[in-house]
């Protein structure tokens, strides 16, 4: 009997878990795929574990909860108690048939799903200490040292860790002492294929050949995604381009500014309409583990203006597919926006360059090929040394 592949996930992970599941089905088609959802199949089936963990949240994070620097929900998966319970429960659940599995793979790094005796891999978009790379990060929001030690075990219990970006790879090495050859950046792709009925197909642009001077901001977290800074930059843009428009999709900030259009939340099916209407895409985010929304902007051949932090330098090629700047420097941001609004040809060139980046690197087929080849190589090494 052929061995199975074990896939451990939690929820949808913004549809990333669907995309990764498809990768495993495609790349390891000769093996049955078994899926365990940590929330639905493990924690929800153990009420005692759930309630004990709420007590653990209070024990570890009471000062932060009282000061409101952290929310109970954010802390729930960051207690040593839940970390150990997940790890131990999975080990007990599968101990008797661990020989049935070729390997296991988990997405995200909020729990240790490794099982002794099964080669284990991790695919993640962040580490907690990646936040140290962001100048605006509030260190009072750091989770407990005890939990960070549990997080360290996640990476060290894996045969290999795969990251969506190079700065997260560097964090694994610098902050968690993961050997360089045990962590690899494989990037990520757009999840619109599974999140929408239109299968992620880009809508033809409706921006009058990049001449309509519309800037799109698409994001749910207005503050974290740099919305206030964009408004400040946009006011400066209006001094040179009084007909420019800024469309805000995904959130509803209260802002008094000319030509500032709040669209708010829209169904996922309609998000591509707002990419299609834009000439420029701008989200000057202050924190960005990866940023799939920028991949989707490139899928629509839009030039991007964003921040020079996190994963953005690996997504946006400075001066070729977009412009990057310090997210707090609104004067430079305004200049970059004006440069694009004044040159439809530059917009077209940047958009085409970004589109090629998606076709060649930032797509799930490329991610799947790279990850699967690496997993096979690691397994060959493990099994050959065992024999």
Regions found by a protein language model. Give the residues of each.
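Aromatic "clamp/platform" in nucleotide-sugar-dependent glycosyltransferases that forms part
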Residues: 286
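Conserved acidic donor-binding segment of nucleotide-sugar-dependent glycosyltransferases
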Residues: 318-319, 323-330, 339-345
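Short hydrophobic beta-strand element within catalytic cores of glycosyltransferases
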Residues: 303-306, 316
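Short alpha-helical donor nucleotide-sugar binding micro-motif in glycosyltransferases
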Residues: 266, 273-278
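Membrane-proximal helix-turn-helix segments that form the acceptor-binding/catalytic region
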Residues: 141-161
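A short, well-ordered alpha-helix in the C-terminal region of glycosyltransferases
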Residues: 332, 339, 346-361, 367-373
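Conserved donor-binding/catalytic core segment of Leloir-type glycosyltransferases
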Residues: 193, 199-225, 231-235
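Carbohydrate-associated surface elements
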Residues: 167, 189
């Amino acid at each position: 009997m052929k061995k199975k592949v074990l896939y451990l996930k939690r929820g949808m992970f913004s549809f990333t878990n669907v995309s990764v599941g498809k990768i495993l089905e495609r790349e390891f088609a000769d093996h049955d795929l078994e899926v365990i959802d940590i929330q639905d199949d493990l924690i929800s089936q153990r009420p005692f574990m759930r309630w004990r963990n709420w007590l653990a949240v209070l024990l570890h994070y009471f000062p932060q909860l009282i000061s409101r620097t952290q929310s109970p929900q954010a802390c729930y998966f960051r207690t040593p108690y839940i970390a150990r319970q997940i790890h131990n429960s999975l080990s007990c659940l599968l101990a008797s048939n661990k020989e049935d599995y070729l390997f296991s793979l988990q997405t995200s790094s909020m729990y240790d799903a490794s099982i002794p005796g099964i080669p284990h891999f991790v695919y993640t978009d962040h580490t907690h200490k990646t936040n140290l790379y962001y100048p605006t990060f509030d260190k009072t929001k750091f989770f407990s040292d005890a939990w960070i030690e549990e997080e360290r075990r996640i990476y060290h219990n894996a045969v290999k860790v795969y990251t969506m970006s190079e700065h997260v790879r560097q964090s694994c090495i610098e902050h968690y002492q993961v050997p360089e050859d045990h962590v690899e950046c494989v990037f990520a792709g757009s999840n619109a294929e599974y999140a929408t009925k239109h299968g992620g197909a880009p809508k033809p642009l409706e921006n009058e050949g990049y001449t309509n001077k519309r800037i799109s901001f698409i994001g749910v977290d207005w503050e974290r995604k740099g919305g206030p800074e964009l408004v400040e930059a946009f006011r400066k843009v209006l001094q040179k381009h009084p007909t420019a428009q800024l469309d805000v999709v995904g959130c509803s900030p209260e802002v008094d500014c000319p030509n500032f259009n709040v669209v708010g939340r829209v169904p996922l099916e309609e998000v591509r309409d707002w990419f299609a209407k834009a000439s420029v895409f701008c989200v000057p985010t202050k924190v960005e583990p990866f940023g799939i929304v920028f991949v989707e902007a490139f899928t629509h051949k839009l030039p991007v203006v964003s921040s020079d932090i996190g994963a953005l330098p690996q997504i946006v090629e400075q001066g070729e597919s977009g412009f990057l700047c310090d997210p707090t420097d609104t004067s430079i941001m305004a200049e970059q926006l004006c440069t694009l609004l004044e040159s439809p040809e530059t917009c077209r060139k940047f958009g085409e360059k970004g589109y090629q980046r998606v076709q060649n690197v930032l797509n799930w087929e490329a991610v799947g090929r790279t990850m699967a080849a690496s997993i096979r190589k690691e397994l060959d090494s493990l099994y050959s040394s065992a024999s």
